[in-house]
Amino acid sequence: LVGYTLVTATLLVSAGRVSDMYGRVRLYNAGFAVFTAGSILCFFVQGQGNTAALELIVFRLVQGVGGAFLFANSAAILTDAFPPDQRGLAMGMNQIGMLAGTFGGLLLGGVLATIDWRAVFLVSVPFGLFGTVWAYLMLHETATIRAHQRLDLPGNVLFAVGLTLVLVGFTYAIQPYGNSSMGWGNPSVIGEIVGGLALLAVFIAAERRVPDPMFRLELFRIRMFAAGNIAGFLSSLARGGLQLVLIVWLQGIWLPLHGYAFEDAPLWAAVYMLPMTAGFLLAGPLSGALSDRYGARYFSTGGMLITAAAFVGFLTLPVDFDFAPFALLLLMLGIGMGAFASPNTASIMNAVPPEHRGASSGMRATFQNVASSLSLTLIFSLVVAGLSSSLPGALYGRLTAAGIPSGVASNISGVPPVGALFAAFLGYNPMATLIPGSVLAGLPSAARATVLSNSFFPQLLAGPFHDGLQVAFSVCVVLSLGAAAASWLRGRRYIHDYEVGQSAKVAQEPVVTHVGSGGASTTKRAEAAGIGRSPPTSTSGRLTPYCACPVSGQSPAPPPHSWVNMISSSPDRMTPTIASATDSAESALTDHESPPT
């Protein structure tokens, strides 16, 4: 479950940093190809048991590498391609595609799983192949490539190892250890978490001393960048594990209790989650477009307040709830998350200098992926804690009521809560193996049929699982309110005006290009497009930014067409334009490159 997320989270910042140096589109294209190759390899996993499981884990790691290349660059590419007054809408449309793909995959996976579990991985292949070809043919580099910078290899190693230890430690923390229902007392878990945090502390200290750091710590001096990432982290921590928990609730408990056969439960669980997707589809582009005009503060804050209200509503649901209020709360949850996501992402990307957008996008995605991984552990730890307190008594009472001897029932009631939870999720009743055959043979036929039925475990877990969910939803309310507070503290709308500096560099310096197969150099096409003209100046001779900083209540004007940073239109698909900086241009921009804190 965590291998893909683990690899993606550890590589996101590195992928973003590499894309700043060698090109975002190039790495984005590679992401499609690698992810598709990983999906094909997963489909061809052979056999059963440990060997097949190991192969599947390795190939999922390959998918994670491709996913990191994609996630690290999507927001940066959109920020480069769209003017500031359209970026919120662009982010909203992008996130709609991601969410629609996620739930579309759940639906298709539910159908294909009834045929062959390997076929689930085929869902990604046609989209991946199309994306690889389309991105290669249609996407062109619009960012300035800075290949002269060096990759921080020691920093990459420290970050990857430290984060891996932390995430692995938290993952194994939900496994039983000794007589405990969870592994928080396991010395290995404690050692992994402490060791990982220590390496991350060393990483942060080292990043302050290298000339080309992997993690641009100075970006946290920008208030909107810092507040936006804190809000995004808390938001992902609140909702990251929510989808899986809700699917477990539906697929493992609610649907079987309402007469659905287990083989149909995965498909119907995805169908019943659609109201959340609908809410996101409604709110995402709308809030993004409005935030382009009015700023992200009100929409991102309001979105998290709606999310918190939805979690409060989940607290009021009974164990055997009606679907109508459940669907309404899912819709609220989707609206809240959609209203928050695209304005928050756009405000983060608007706040940073263009030359750091790849690294900034990777940092933003890393915070969200790490929070989602930690959320999975947090939510399941809270649910398992609730199960631990009430499951043994419920299990003992149900077994003795069915005629199981007290001693046998007492032994069975010590089953690990995690095992019981996933047994219900997988549609497996372990009573046939836990209860001795001689005891089962001595039970009346009706009692034996009840104990061995597929509905026995869902009925047994419904109450204890609901107790754990109450604790988890309460924590999610607090985290959502924290994200709302961070969103509000981002301050007034701010868009970094460093694009003018980049335009000045392009205008004042010769353009270094490659010659395309058609024979015409990009330099001539750039001159024809207007590059080389001087940017507008104020009466004092200073450069006039096209986007004032901060902006309050007005839409920023898009940059003139003649100020593009890079032209890429040669027949051989991509010819990056590399502009060099001059001391005169840097000195002319001194007053424009320091964002308010």
Give the role of each language-model region.
Residues 1-137, 287, 312-315:
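Transmembrane-helix bundle of Major Facilitator Superfamily
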Residues 26-30, 34, 296-302, 472:
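Juxtamembrane helix-start motifs in multi-pass secondary transporters
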Residues 115-232, 238, 523-526:
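Hydrophobic transmembrane-helix bundles of small-molecule transporters
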Residues 205, 224, 292, 304, ...:
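Transmembrane-helix exit segments and adjacent C-terminal regions of multi-pass membrane proteins
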Residues 95-96, 100-103, 232-233, 242, ...:
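Small-residue-rich alpha-helical segments with characteristic i,i+4
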